[in-house]
């Protein structure tokens, strides 16, 4: 009788536990994390990889659990498609990338969730040839603009043209990756190029001139990507997911401190781009350095992703609607902030949503 009572009590206790805790599987031996890869002077480096290993202590923490990290390279020329394919085929568990590609991936079926936002840190730029007389987006109406469709900065481009009463149909969009787009601008094949901070390299080489950027635009026009995790991995290994997210939040905290800004730029950011280019990207920005690295799931982030999901469908990039609660999973960041005593370090931001008309993204 006593044994039966103990059995029922134990069973009741197990059923009372959250599913993610009660049925977590034994940790895998390897965690596969995809990230943008750069080859600088024959040395392979991963975007944010070195920082999270050193300042976040990820490798050391996982080693104590008997888990190794396998970095999976994603070429800068096609980050979104490569990572989306990796998630879809089950070849990766985590990935650090931008906001539009994972929305496109989840439109087929819920596959990934954002478990650790990297903040509001990505600027987009409109560049014209150095000798071009164009000074505004309106000056490029009817002309060729190199833009890689389906990449995160497409949202910023759509915001820009829609704010001027224009649409994709007002331009001849050349859908090529950033490297090809930059080369096309340098050779005079296109009249404009829309991309990320490598726009400063075009200026540095005196082949391009930046005429617009998101630096002084509404903060929600910036890229808001982060660390995404496979739904299957989250379900099987919630504790390990928490360990990884905590390391990323710890890295964000370290990076966000003004005292560490120079070290971050010199030792980590410059693994991909020259220091001068990195500093130009960060200087004179409407978003403060600390806030650039906020991992909060605040109204600003939710509004941004609601807009991204809406734009993806309106523009014809996806057929199915993507629900916000299938994209965002704040529980791991919330736990990490408590564990690291950072609950009040970052402040939530409310950002007025940029209204995108369906016409802005049409005309592929």
Protein language model regions, located:
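Segments of small-molecule ligand-sensing domains
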Residues: 26-31, 279-364
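Flexible hinge/capping segments at coil-to-helix
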Residues: 129-144, 235-239
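Extracytoplasmic "Venus flytrap"
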Residues: 30-54, 78, 150
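Ligand-binding cleft/hinge of the Venus flytrap
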Residues: 49-68, 154-172, 205
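Secondary-structure end/capping motifs
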Residues: 38-43, 237-322
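Pocket-lining segment of extracytoplasmic ligand-binding domains
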Residues: 174, 179-275
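Short helix-initiation/N-cap motifs at beta->coil->alpha
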Residues: 70-85, 98, 166, 171-186
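A ligand-binding cleft/hinge motif common to bilobed small-molecule-binding domains
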Residues: 96-108, 158-159, 190-210, 304, ...
